Amino acid sequence: MKNIRNFCIIAHIDHGKSTLADRLLDFTGAVTEREKQEQLLDSMDLERERGITIKSHAIQMDYVHEGEEFVLNLIDTPGHVDFSYEVSRSIAACEGALLVVDAAQSIQAQTISNLYLALENDLEIIPVLNKVDLPSANPEEVTDDIVDLLGCDPSEVIPASAKTGLGIKEILDAIINRVPAPSGKVDAPLRALIFDSVYNPFRGVETYFRVINGSIKKGEKIKFVATGKTYDADEVGTLRLKQFPRKEIKTGDVGYLITGIKDAREVKVGDTITSAVNPTTEAVAGFEDVKPMVFAGIYPVDTEDYEDLRSSMEKLQLNDASLVFLPESSAALGFGFRCGFLGMLHLEIIQERLEREFDMTVITTVPNVSYHAYTNKNPDDVILVNNPSDLPEPSSLNRVEEPFIKATIITKADYVGNVMGLCIEKRGEITNQTYLTTERVELTFDMPLAEIVFDFYDRLKTVSRGYASFDYTPIGLRESKLVKVDVLLNANIVDALSALLHVDNAYDIGKKMCEKLKELIPRQQFDIPIQAAIGAKIIARETVKALRKDVTAKCYGGDISRKRKLLEKQKKGKKRMRQVGNVEIPQEAFMAVLKLND
């Protein structure tokens, strides 16, 4: 046990976690020449293309240091704020962390939020300055930033380049010398932390775990604490590039477990595995059910594909237990699902995976967050509003509460004004402003989650020329004045375009929606009024003008009554058409509502 080291790599997006992991694997010989490829641990095509890590991965390496053999378990973590719970569980499975900072970009918001997670779990932090070979790198200044943040000695910061392989040996030596060995009781009852699960179509769910006390043997009966279900450990082993079956996994080590579970929802990340015969009394602390933050409707473009969409969603859920969905129907779009996601990136990824892996073309409605509504009749009973149509009638509504977050934004000092302007426009309240260095400022805001869902991230990058980085944590619900804005086409409500908005923004957004739809809806043979309404009150209107034939073209001479007769006849026809006419909404219209400011 004293020769095991468990560590993870934490960094902001794009600071080079996955490439550094590749180099560590090369250096320790965990990968043969034939298996090498860029971002080896990112197994999804999507992860490779976008250059992000979506799932956590784990891999074991052997390394000989001063004649002794050591086993290193690397747990790779996602960098994106949507997956912060997954990161926190991976961190809890380690004793040390490599804090990777890009020498050109310095410390960013997620570097700090993941660092706090690591410090809360008492991890030994090894700072690594990555990308020092870049022409734009600024190693001295960034080293000072790291020293300020961690309070460490400048000599402890390891300069490295994952691209060229510089500093890799120093990193491995630092892991062995500075990261403590696992401390656990070998003879205590089994207690292991689940930090990830992967669905394998042939063998069911593979559970990745780290043993804290005791050991887990092949064939023994085990129990998951949160769900209370018992299983047989059909196979246990360690994770090399391929799985490596073993008879038992001992205290302090990381491994995988196959029990033949077919439903990923039974394996909860952060849960505790214990023996069914001799269970542990205390579970590993910090487990929580992952709650979706953002909701959107997903509908098949062709209503007949509903069943295919259902089976695709179920297959995705096997691999991604944080996805939740319920059937719902809409008058405009037919049958579909109301889905819950961890954040906007998660929503995009699911949509892309549906298109890629299952060839489904889907329509996504306006994403919104989950509100709590209270009626006058029962002011204490919470009504969960995940869909604008669930909001009670305005007359019976007592109050609505919406989720707030604490947003941390790190930006260059030159852009503070722009960033503040954007956050205040998004109903944020500034709570703190700290200068990290003379150049870089950390701003914290309390703001509604709903404002971030739309286009906040893109606009933040725009106003700061790409320099600002952003991170958030939920801080609970607050009361807020919200109204439901409906969009009417030809006097019919289009339920898929309804949105819950704050009173102050309702008029502006309603007007913008109407203008945007006017551009996108093709002209028909009759006038189409597009209206935005709060309840029965119309707040904005645009009209898509009719296409009309010039009926008077065949009249020579000037008899006005003849012309008038033809025009009146045309007018009657158009009126009749409008009563029976049906307006098709193009797919772009639904997406365009999300990008109102372009």
Swiss-Prot record:
This is Elongation factor 4. Required for accurate and efficient protein synthesis under certain stress conditions. May act as a fidelity factor of the translation reaction, by catalyzing a one-codon backward translocation of tRNAs on improperly translocated ribosomes. Back-translocation proceeds from a post-translocation (POST) complex to a pre-translocation (PRE) complex, thus giving elongation factor G a second chance to translocate the tRNAs correctly. Binds to ribosomes in a GTP-dependent manner. It is a peripheral membrane protein. PROSITE patterns: G_TR_2 (PS51722). Belongs to the TRAFAC class translation factor GTPase superfamily. Classic translation factor GTPase family. LepA subfamily. The gene is lepA. Transmembrane segments: none annotated. The keyword tRNA processing does not apply. InterPro entries: EF-4, EFG_III/V, EFG_V-like, EFTu-like_2, LepA_C_sf, LepA_CTD, LepA_IV, P-loop_NTPase. The keyword Protein biosynthesis applies. One of its GO terms (biological process) is positive regulation of translation. It is found in: Cell inner membrane. One of its GO terms (cellular component) is plasma membrane. It catalyses: GTP + H2O = GDP + phosphate + H(+). GTP binds at D14, H15, G16, K17, S18, T19, N130, K131, V132, D133. GO terms for molecular function: GTP binding; GTPase activity; ribosome binding; translation elongation factor activity. Keywords: Cell inner membrane, Cell membrane, GTP-binding, Hydrolase, Membrane, Nucleotide-binding, Protein biosynthesis. Its EC number is 3.6.5.n1. Residues 2-183 form the tr-type G domain.
